[in-house]
Regions:
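Negatively charged
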Residues: 1-105
Length: 105
């Protein structure tokens, strides 16, 4: 979606986006190196998402995440590198540190 938007510093209000049918959120903000904050996306419906791989990877300027603890990640099988190269102070909910794996045929 916004992958590799290296000059992107802020986003419009994307909190009301209908994400209920989204299956892949992988790389959504990957490479947005100047993005300093995100709108409140805590109410996004993520019950159908299967991949969040590299979602926030290389977001060097991102200092905090919205409260994504509300997200339903029951179907997510790939969270590899979800916050790779982000600041150590980024508050990542514990449940997002578990990588679920699945075999695809």
């Amino acid at each position: 979606m916004f992958s590799n938007c290296r000059s992107l510093k802020s986003l419009p209000d994307i909190s009301k986006w209908n994400t209920s049918n989204v299956v892949n959120m992988g790389n959504m903000f990957n490479g947005c190196t100047l993005l300093a904050s995100l709108p409140n996306i805590s109410n996004w419906k993520t019950n159908n998402v299967q991949s969040m791989e590299c979602m926030f990877q290389d977001c060097y300027s991102l200092s905090s995440l919205p409260d994504i603890n509300k997200w339903n990640i029951d179907k997510v099988y790939n969270m590899e590198n979800i916050c790779k190269e982000c600041k150590d102070t980024l508050n990542i909910p514990e449940k997002f540190k578990i990588i679920k794996k699945s075999i695809e045929y």
